[in-house]
UniProtKB/Swiss-Prot annotation:
The record marks K7, K229 as: Transition state stabilizer. One of its GO terms (molecular function) is ATP binding. Keywords: Amino-acid biosynthesis, Arginine biosynthesis, ATP-binding, Cytoplasm, Kinase, Nucleotide-binding, Transferase. One of its GO terms (biological process) is L-arginine biosynthetic process. Substrate binds at G41, G42, R63, N166. It catalyses: N-acetyl-L-glutamate + ATP = N-acetyl-L-glutamyl 5-phosphate + ADP. This is Acetylglutamate kinase. Catalyzes the ATP-dependent phosphorylation of N-acetyl-L-glutamate. It is an enzyme of class 2 (transferase). It comes from Anaeromyxobacter sp. (strain K). Transmembrane segments: none annotated. GO terms for cellular component: cytoplasm.
């Protein structure tokens, strides 16, 4: 039995790839594997803000969240996307349970204090109603796993006073993987894994250790935005997860293979 945390971007919720994910999830859950899903909704939130005439303000790649933006996030992430995602999973034989921070305090958070952020100047930045994860309701998730339900967590946390807080979906997924001591955190992306040649999908690197990552950066194989993404993934391993899988451009069976046969699909990152 394995414990898997799956991170889905908002863009996949209404894509054909979701049905491939759902079918593999059913196979994994039928095999008594424990699966939790974390999803975001950034593109849909930005689109709704534009329709409503609201400014989308980004600071160092993070969304500034005022009261109006938080209302949009509630509607989009905890509302429409969570319901639509659960519906698609249900249609494929998976039994999902939609959750957010206020659902049994599933995602426990505190408001992030102002802090200096890389790329945002020397002064501390206040991101508004943005939260930092301080814990999860692990007994609740454990009960759902025992009954072969799949928790589907929208990336909204909640503090002890009941205030909803916007949290980056990758952050929620990474910290949940650590808290569960997950066998794998699977990041579904737009690429089939880490590539030696970004123009050649067949140049996928099946497995990377920390030492190999440093060598690939030094020789220029890994460059640009992939460097911080992989740095963050190796931090997840230090936080308690056993592996991180980068997976995309899915074919039938890819998710199942990536979890049960590490390296057979996507790229698996391991600590050593």
């Amino acid at each position: 039995m394995k414990t898997i945390v799956l991170k889905l971007g908002g863009e996949i919720v209404h894509s054909p790839e979701l049905d491939l994910v759902a079918r593999d999830l059913r196979t994994l859950v039928d095999g008594w594997n424990r699966v939790a899903i974390v999803h975001g909704g950034g593109p849909q939130a930005t689109a709704l803000q534009k329709r409503l005439g609201l400014e989308t303000r980004m600071v160092a790649g993070r969304r500034f969240t005022d009261e109006a933006t938080l209302e949009v996030m509630k509607y989009v992430v905890a509302g429409r996307l969570n319901v639509d995602l659960c519906g698609r999973l249900l249609a494929n034989g998976v039994m999902p349970v939609g959750l957010h921070g206020a659902s049994g305090h599933a995602i426990q958070a505190t408001r992030r204090p102002p802090r200096v952020m890389q790329g945002a100047g020397p002064e501390p930045v206040d991101l508004g109603l943005v939260g930092d994860v301080v814990g999860f309701n692990l007994p609740l998730l454990g009960d759902l796993f025992e009954r072969r339900y799949v928790p589907v967590l929208a990336c909204l946390g909640c503090d002890d006073a009941g205030q909803a807080l916007n949290i980056n979906g990758d952050t929620v997924a990474s910290q949940l993987a650590g808290a569960l001591r997950a066998d794998a955190l699977v990041l579904v992306t737009s690429t089939p894994g880490v590539l030696r040649d970004v123009k050649d999908p067949s140049s996928r690197i099946p497995r990377i250790t920390r030492a190999e990552f440093e060598r690939l950066v030094a020789d220029g194989t890994i460059s640009g935005g992939m460097i911080p993404k992989l740095e963050e993934s190796f931090e997840v391993l230090r936080g308690g997860a056993r592996s991180v899988v980068i997976l995309g451009k899915l074919a039938p069976g890819d998710l199942e293979a990536a979890v049960l046969e590490p390296g057979s699909a996507g790229t698996v990152l391991v600590g050593e």
